[in-house]
Regions:
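Bacterial N-terminal signal peptides that target proteins for export
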Residues: 1-11
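Bacterial N-terminal signal peptides
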Residues: 9-19
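Acidic, glycine-rich low-complexity segments
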Residues: 24-315
Length: 315
């Protein structure tokens, strides 16, 4: 009787194991250095990795929260010269931290499906050419601070909900942040760039905040939804353009200057615009659009003209 019970338990254990029940599959990331190209690929589980450079100049890919790298807790590349880095995380709720990395050319990162996070460490990274970050479906969180990027910086949340915060970036050309039909949040703080930057969040109730920004030009387009746009201490050599689309939107400018033109278009809905110490070298144009719109003038000057139209309330 005991023998039969033992055989039955053994058979059940084998069947459960074969079905994947009672056994744990390790989160696996592969890291391969092909000449001067570092390629990191995840699986469809929740992976957490840190990509960092130590004091000797070695590049380490370290697994966290049970993630294995090449089957081990971490992998070390001895003093590599990285021309390009490609990171493909695929599905799962992934977490990527990049600390003190130097890439001579491009860094491309696709977070894949899932609720993903990309963060920078205490030591800023340097990208010689372009930084491209892509999300997919899910909640995509991007937090980068202090990086130097020689070319363009592009963050595209794809179909997910984008929560992007870029702080103290020095970008050679442009910053581009793109959301989709979700409640996106984009924050740029203390960024300097040489190109014309743009933020596009499309539908849903979005929030865009730009503070201490110096660049060639800036375009913000939030499209439909109850959107909020705030620009504070923003200076550009070229145009500043904001379009919030239909529904009830709020736009506030404080200490905003363009050496060319400023255009704000609020479109349909009961919108409001407030400006304090706002100036354009040439034209400053503000369009309220359909609805009962509010215009608060705390010092707005267009060198050639100041054109305020389709606003109904002037408190």
């Amino acid at each position: 009787m005991h023998c039969c019970r033992f055989l039955l338990n053994l058979t059940l254990f084998g069947l459960l194991g074969f079905a994947g029940i009672g056994s744990a599959k390790a989160n696996t990331v592969n890291a391969i250095l092909e000449g001067e190209l570092l390629v990191i690929t995840g699986d469809n589980l929740a992976n957490a990795i840190t990509l960092t450079t130590n004091s000797a100049g070695d590049v380490l890919v370290v697994g966290r929260n049970g993630t294995l790298v090449n089957g081990a807790p971490s992998v070390r590349f001895r003093r590599p010269v990285l021309n390009s880095v490609e990171i493909l995380m695929f599905g799962g709720n992934d977490n990527v931290l990049i600390n003190g990395l130097t890439v001579n050319n491009d860094l491309f990162l696709n977070l894949g499906d899932g609720n993903d996070t990309l963060r920078s460490g205490l030591v800023p990274s340097s990208i010689g050419a372009n930084l491209s970050v892509e999300g997919a479906s899910g909640n995509e969180i991007v937090r980068l601070a202090g990086w130097t990027i020689g070319g363009d910086c592009t963050v595209d949340g794809q179909t997910g909900t984008l929560n992007c915060e870029l702080t103290g970036l020095n970008v050679g050309f442009a910053i581009t942040a793109i959301g989709d039909e979700a409640r996106d949040v984009v924050t740029l703080a203390g960024c300097t760039m040489g190109g014309f930057s743009s933020i596009e969040t499309r539908g849903a109730n979005d929030s865009v905040t730009v503070t201490d920004f110096i660049g060639l030009g800036l375009s913000v387009n939030t499209d439909a939804g109850l959107d909020s746009v705030a620009l504070t201490r923003v200076a550009t050599l070229e145009d500043i353009y904001v379009n919030t689309g239909v529904h009830r939107d709020t736009v506030n400018f404080t200490d905003v200057n363009s050496d060319r033109n400023i255009t704000v278009s609020l479109d349909g809905g009961d919108d409001s615009f407030g400006g304090v110490n706002v100036s354009a070298q040439y034209d400053a144009v503000f369009e309220g659009g359909a609805g009962i719109d509010t215009f608060l003038d705390g010092g707005i000057i267009g060198g050639t003209k100041t054109d305020v139209k389709e606003f109904e309330i002037f408190p």
